[in-house]
Amino acid sequence: MALGIDDFDGLVGTNISGTSDLAPLDEQAGIIKELFPDAKTVGLLYCSAEANSQYQVDTVKASLEELGYTCEYYAFSDSNDLATVCQSAADASDVIYVPTDNTVANNTEIVNNICQPAGVPVVAGEEGIMSGCGVATLSISYYDLGVATGKMAAKILTGESKVEEMPIEYAPQFTKEYNPTIAEALGITIPDDYVAYEG
């Protein structure tokens, strides 16, 4: 998708297949609407060096704008300018969205140390980031994704399937989760259909 393939059907046609950890981006925008219906501005915080993050924030931005939010990009180039950019996002946003971004995943403490004192909730692209700095997520299970990947590999090794005929697979299910510590600190009431992250 980051390569501009609009009609990708999951088949590469060569000796490549596997699984994708792409989250349900439209539905992630939906949980922002569900949890923060009165918010006006959403800051999209991501690393500009990660093409996967750019794709995610572009998609979420389009969905959020359809829901009536004003969105701004807050891109940082690496961990050295994350704090400065995050502070700008916190100063100007009612809510911050962070995709499944590797740089943020490795620096959630920086994000939390800025956003939580500022009273700005972070909705994350997956549970690992949420556990460090987010209030909620609609996340895949990397365990379940690993099981799916293993089953694909088994089919190839046993000769049941040919790799070039196997479409890319996606996570079989997603879970609404919340971080009880951050939710309590920010005074946010979470609906009953969210599962408390116990990491």
Stretches with model-predicted labels:
Residues 15-16, 63-79:
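Short beta-strand elements in bilobed, periplasmic/extracellular small-molecule ligand-binding domains
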Residues 42-45, 93-105, 122-125:
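Periplasmic-binding protein-like
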Residues 6-13, 82-84, 130-139:
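Glycine-rich, charge-decorated loop segments at or immediately adjacent to ligand/cofactor-binding or catalytic sites
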Residues 3-41, 140-161:
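Hydrophobic alpha-helical segments within soluble ligand-binding/sensing domains
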Residues 1-8, 111-133:
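Venus flytrap/periplasmic-binding-protein-like
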Residues 75-89:
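Structural motif
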Residues 155-199:
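Hinge/cleft segment of the Venus flytrap/periplasmic-binding protein
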Residues 18-64, 165-183:
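An alpha-beta-alpha
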